[in-house]
Curated annotation (Swiss-Prot):
Protein's UniProt name: Ashwin
Residue numbers bearing the Phosphoserine modification: S143, S182, S189, S193
Main localization (coarse): nucleus
Basic and acidic residues composition bias: residue spans: 64-97, 116-127, 163-179
Keywords: Nucleus, Phosphoprotein
Membrane-spanning parts: none
rRNA processing found in the keyword field: no
Residue ranges of the region described as Disordered: 64-232
Length: 232
């Protein structure tokens, strides 16, 4: 319920302070809610109803606060409370939302988009796909590589042949040295390693006669026990 007082719009709370602007039914209803008895004669007359309303039901002004520290603090709280009420009345729907609604029309294109660059860079991702010419080059390279297989195979066989020749030469030299150094008799040598295997070092076995001679040539003094000298 709202009205106009002096050419300006008034809220319901302000109208309660002006009972002459209220209707007769509203005055009766407020008096009944306040449990104020109204006689039948007064129900017909609006002036008597207004007098009763001013006497018992009109909202009284708030008491003046003292000019102390507590009074100033309470005045600030009242002002803040009134401001909050006004904001809730003006925008009840906006108060429920924590963030304002963002509406994109689609017509504005002035927005700028920032892209973060990674360490490796995204340029490789954005490159175009290779064309058909690149595929033809790969086929040519594969055909060239197939033609160059045979010389590579031959060259891979060369080092094995060289190793075999070197191994045979080493075996022959070792065999000649063993025959020259052992005048007493033939020396048993291990069987030759197969062709292509790793070369094995040959150790010359000492004959039995040389071993016995070395034992006999040892000085006899080494076998004597040490005699302890005793004083007389």
């Amino acid at each position: 319920m709202a009205g106009d007082v002096g050419g300006r719009s008034c809220t319901d709370s302000e109208l309660l302070l002006h009972p002459e602007l209220l209707s007769q039914e509203f005055l009766l209803l407020t008096l009944e809610q306040k449990n104020i008895t109204v006689e039948n004669d007064m129900r017909v007359n609006k002036d008597s109803l207004t007098d009763l309303y001013v006497q018992h039901a009109i909202p009284l002004p708030q008491r003046d606060l003292p000019k102390s520290r507590w009074g100033k603090m309470m005045e600030k709280k009242r002002e803040q409370h009134e401001i909050k009420k006004e904001t809730k009345r003006s925008s009840p729907a906006d108060g429920l939302r924590k963030r304002p609604l963002i509406v994109f029309d689609g017509s504005s294109t002035s927005t700028t988009i920032k892209v973060k660059k990674t360490e490796n860079g995204d340029n490789d991702r954005l490159r175009p796909q290779p064309q058909a010419s690149a595929t033809s080059n790969t086929f040519r390279k594969s055909s060239d590589s197939s033609s160059s297989v045979s010389p590579l195979v031959l060259s891979s066989n060369l080092p094995t042949n060289n190793k075999m020749e070197h191994g045979n030469n080493d075996n022959k030299q070792n065999h000649d040295l063993t025959h020259r150094k052992s005048p007493l008799g033939p020396v048993r040598s291990p069987p030759l390693s197969p062709v292509g295997a790793t070369p094995v070092k040959l150790k010359r076995a000492a004959p039995k006669e040389e071993a016995e001679a070395s034992i006999n040539l040892k000085p006899p003094e080494a076998k004597r026990k040490i005699q302890h000298v005793t004083w007389p």
